[in-house]
A protein has these predicted regions:
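Post-cleavage N-terminal segment of exported redox proteins
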Residues: 2-47, 94, 134-139, 143-226, ...
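Short glycine/threonine-rich turn/loop motifs
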Residues: 25-131, 199-304
Length: 304
């Protein structure tokens, strides 16, 4: 039995490893046209990497969504991510921003009687644009006191003229409208091939361009077998309508996972992360969105 368990784990791990991006040839499936950024996407990139938009300065979106670790936190020995204020932390590990643009808008499926989509593990942001607004004002993240303070910094940023070129000469005079455009530009950047490469070995395998090793194929078989791993029941691995698989169905599940003692040590013994329940009501306590398994070999730690 121990030997079979080891083979199972090794096979599944091999499957996860093939979902990593291949940095050498062959040429990525995304086209060269997708890599050319519009002016709005260029602005979104500037905002995404601007470390001056936190208070105190020093943290940007890219600080916690680093390309080296598939757009998640580079700090892999902590169960939570660090904020710009020394000593402050979030309550979860940073989720990957890769492929997040494909999540459907947060909604309740009356037929299936469950919640689907949205951003964050608890679905508290309806879409990518709304998600982009949150970290700037979160005291445990970028800690800006209000929207106006963010816009004031943008007024003196090197890309202020680009902001006006994209959204109008007077846009920065209205902090509420300007802040909405900040989120729009970041979401637009996150919709580019920079975040959605679809260039893993598994993508090339689906396109018929490479073959899986015997161990990788065994991992895939276990992953999809309803009587064995059945991982694909939630982490979809098939192409649908010509689209590449995203390894999530964007639903919310309660797996009965106990509280992480490392998080309790930081947040207090009484801390409880109720997940979706915080967003829609206590009847959904303990449910969290099914995460994508793309690039999972790079996105540790693998607990919320």
């Amino acid at each position: 039995m121990p030997h079979k368990r080891f083979v199972f784990i090794l096979a599944i791990t091999s499957l996860f490893n093939i979902s990593q991006t291949i940095h050498a040839e062959p040429t990525p499936l995304s086209t060269l046209e997708e890599k050319k950024l519009t002016l709005e996407q260029q602005l979104g990139k500037q905002l995404f990497f601007d470390t001056n938009l936190s208070s105190p300065p020093g943290q940007s979106c890219a600080s916690c969504h680093d390309i080296k670790t598939s757009l998640t936190d580079v700090i892999q020995n902590s169960p939570v991510s660090l904020g710009t204020v020394t000593g402050r932390t979030g309550t979860r590990n940073t989720p990957s921003a890769a492929y997040s643009a494909f999540a459907p808008g947060f909604h309740f499926d009356a037929e299936e009687e469950l919640y689907i989509g949205g951003q964050f593990l608890d679905g508290r942001a309806a879409n990518l644009k709304e998600q982009a607004k949150a970290p700037f004002l979160n005291p445990d993240e970028m800690n800006s006191p209000d929207e106006q303070s963010v816009i004031n910094k943008i007024k003196t940023a090197r890309y202020a003229s680009l902001f006006k070129q994209v959204f109008g000469e007077q846009i920065l005079n209205d902090s509420k409208k300007a802040y909405d455009k900040v989120a729009q530009a970041i979401a637009s950047f996150e919709n580019t091939a920079n975040f959605n490469r679809f260039s893993s070995k598994y993508d090339y395998f689906l396109a018929g361009r490479v073959a899986l090793s015997k161990l990788e194929q065994k991992g895939l078989d276990l992953f999809e077998d309803e009587d064995k791993g059945n991982c694909a029941a939630c982490h979809t691995s098939k192409t649908e309508g010509g689209s590449q698989p995203l390894f999530t169905d964007y639903t919310y599940d309660n797996l009965g996972t106990p509280s992480n003692p490392e998080i309790l040590a930081l947040k207090g013994a009484d801390f409880v992360d109720v997940g979706l329940g915080e967003t829609v009501g206590s009847e959904e306590n303990g449910k969290f969105k099914v995460p994508s398994l793309r690039n999972i070999a790079k996105t540790a730690p693998l607990y919320a």
